Design a protein with these regions (language model features):
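ATP-binding/phosphotransfer module of carbohydrate and carboxylate kinases, centering on a glycine-rich
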Residues: 1-121
Length: 121
């Protein structure tokens, strides 16, 4: 692992740094596009199961994580993939928002919904 002082001692030229930047951007693009495709897949399944109730209205997708929060290019790649796959019209209703502690909240909601359907209250 490099410390900030170690980076000063690393010799590199501009060409090598540009290549590293391109490789990193390619990896981030792939990750964002895969995440976007995953979101679209889930939304399409929900649309199929609800017989057309999802894409006709506003749908909010909560994203948790530092990459989405702190890396604007990742967020752009993800949203571009959703727009590309769904098309401009359907994607207008899909809103992707950052959330803190999404996994804890999601687990709580899942447990609550499971309890609701598990028992007739």
């Amino acid at each position: 692992m490099f410390s900030s002082e170690s980076w000063d001692q690393v010799e590199s030229n501009l060409s090598a740094r540009k290549i590293v930047l391109e490789v990193c951007d390619t990896i981030v693009m792939r990750g964002g596009r895969l995440a976007g495709a995953g979101i679209v897949g889930i939304l399409q399944k929900m649309e199929e199961d609800s017989t057309g109730l999802i894409f006709g209205k506003r749908t909010v997708v909560a994203m948790d994580g530092g990459l989405y929060e702190h890396y604007p290019q990742y967020k752009r790649y993800l949203k571009d993939a959703v727009k590309e796959i769904l098309g401009l019209e359907k994607s207008k209703n899909v809103v992707i928002e950052h959330t803190k502690d999404g996994s804890g909240i999601g687990a709580s909601l899942l447990a609550a919904s499971n309890s609701k359907y598990e028992h007739d209250f």
